[in-house]
């Protein structure tokens, strides 16, 4: 088969969706002999030199602004991918909306439906397009890819997609190389948050809980926040520059994949208090590095962590502060959580994801 994958979310700084698509493409090309092409478009950003060779793919790059192309595709259903990038058997979108196609089987990706349950906490483009179009696009798709059984349930129950058209491609655990602790982490470790600073990540509750932790335990390790900021994060960033958090909380900005492992190597605990998560790749990364995880009990996080994490209501500031104090203060609890996380992470493989994706593409072509 000739496959085209929309790679645009991974073109710049790879966060959740971009990292998922990047690793899925890499696993797929290693596991199959299909001809894979990645599609990128941006007015300013170009694919890195050698990207195609590194992934084992062809690259089609167009100097079209992302927002312009998205508006045309989502609102006008034009131009078809054949006009933009050529003819393929399958075209795979990394998001819930179809890429227009005359001939290719159309595959979409849905991790969660947060844009339906809490649209005011999403970006403007998502608020504009996704709630109105997602259900119709999902029902028209020849196959829907999701990363968890939680996501599969949302797609079948809320969007009305038949279960046999939804394929769960769980991300694989990263193969960490046991690098040393990052130089900006003290020997006592750190409380770590990794993720884009968007509203649903619920960083405000983390800051509240960390402030309470420091009241109870002034010697608590620093809080490091690793992730790209957004306009909505301005209030959080102001808070960490002022007492009582100033000097104890640091925003590192986006940390690329090759440096993130060193952050985990020096972390005492990862905290992920999200209001919703379609997967929560950072929880899997932390478990793979032997770092205890405290996470919310929302979305896919209970499924992903599989009993290895401390789970809390994302609005429970006192509960989060107490959970942090327990792991910071008790080496035995921290070690038990680390062991459980390593065992859970070992159940996630990219080989399995690639095999499921191959079946999704094969079935999609048959339904075309």
For the regions a protein language model found, what residue spans apply to each?
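Carbohydrate transferase catalytic cores enriched for Leloir-type hexosyltransferases
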Residues: 1-368
């Amino acid at each position: 088969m000739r496959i085209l994958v929309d790679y645009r979310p991974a073109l710049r700084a790879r966060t959740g969706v971009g990292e998922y698509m990047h690793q899925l493409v890499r696993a797929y090309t290693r596991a199959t002999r299909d001809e894979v092409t990645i599609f990128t478009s941006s007015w300013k950003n170009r694919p890195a030199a050698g990207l195609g060779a590194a992934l084992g793919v062809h690259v089609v790059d167009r100097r079209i602004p992302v927002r312009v192309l998205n508006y045309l595709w989502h609102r006008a259903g034009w131009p078809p991918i054949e006009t933009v990038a050529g003819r393929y058997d399958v075209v795979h979108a990394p998001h819930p909306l179809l890429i227009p196609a005359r001939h290719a089987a159309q595959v979409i990706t849905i991790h969660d439906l947060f844009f339906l349950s809490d649209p005011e906490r999403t970006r403007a483009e998502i608020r504009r397009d996704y709630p109105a179009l997602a259900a119709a696009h999902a029902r028209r798709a020849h196959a829907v890819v999701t990363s968890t059984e939680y996501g599969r349930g949302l797609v079948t129950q809320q969007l009305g997609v038949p279960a046999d058209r939804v394929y769960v491609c769980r991300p694989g655990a990263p193969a960490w190389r046991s690098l040393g602790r990052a130089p900006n982490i003290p020997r006592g470790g750190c409380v770590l948050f990794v993720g884009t600073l968007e509203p649903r990540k619920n960083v405000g509750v983390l800051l509240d809980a960390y402030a309470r932790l420091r009241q109870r335990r002034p010697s608590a390790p620093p809080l490091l926040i690793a992730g790209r900021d957004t306009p909505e994060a301005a209030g959080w960033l102001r808070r960490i520059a002022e007492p009582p958090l100033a000097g104890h909380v640091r925003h590192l900005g986006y940390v690329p994949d090759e440096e993130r492992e060193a952050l985990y190597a020096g972390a005492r605990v990862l905290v992920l208090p999200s209001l919703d998560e379609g997967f929560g790749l950072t929880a899997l990364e932390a478990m793979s590095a032997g770092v205890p995880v405290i996470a919310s009990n929302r979305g896919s996080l209970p499924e992903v962590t599989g009993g290895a994490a401390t789970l809390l209501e994302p609005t429970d500031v006192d509960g989060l502060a107490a959970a942090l104090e327990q792991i910071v203060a008790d080496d035995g609890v921290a070690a038990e959580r680390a062991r459980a996380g390593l065992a859970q992470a070992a159940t996630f493989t990219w080989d399995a994801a690639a095999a499921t994706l191959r079946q999704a593409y094969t079935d999609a072509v048959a339904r075309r």
